Amino acid sequence: MIRLNQDTPIDVLQDVKNGDLVTDTFSKTGLVEEINISDDGLYRIYEFHLVTGRTISIKK
C-alpha cells in the first residue's frame, strides 16, 4: 500500500500506476482507477481517482 500525502516524494507520486493500492492515511483507501496530473503554474497537482469514487489530491 502506498501512502499519499504532502510528504510523499515526487518520484513516488510519479511511480503510482492504475491498480495500485493507495491510502491518504485518513479515510480514503482503494485501488487507483485513473490518474490526472496538471500544472497550475505554481504547483503540480496529482489527482488519484479511486475505484471507490473518492479522489486523493496532492499539490507539490
What are these regions (language model features)?
Residues 2-4, 57-60:
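Short acidic DE-rich linear segments
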Residues 33-58:
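Basic/aromatic-rich interaction segments and small domains that mediate binding to polyanionic partners
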Residues 1-17:
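Mixed-charge, Lys/Arg-rich low-complexity intrinsically disordered regions
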Residues 10, 28-31:
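Short, charged beta-turn/beta-strand-edge "cap" motif at the junction between a beta-strand
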Residues 17, 28, 59-60:
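Context-gated lysine
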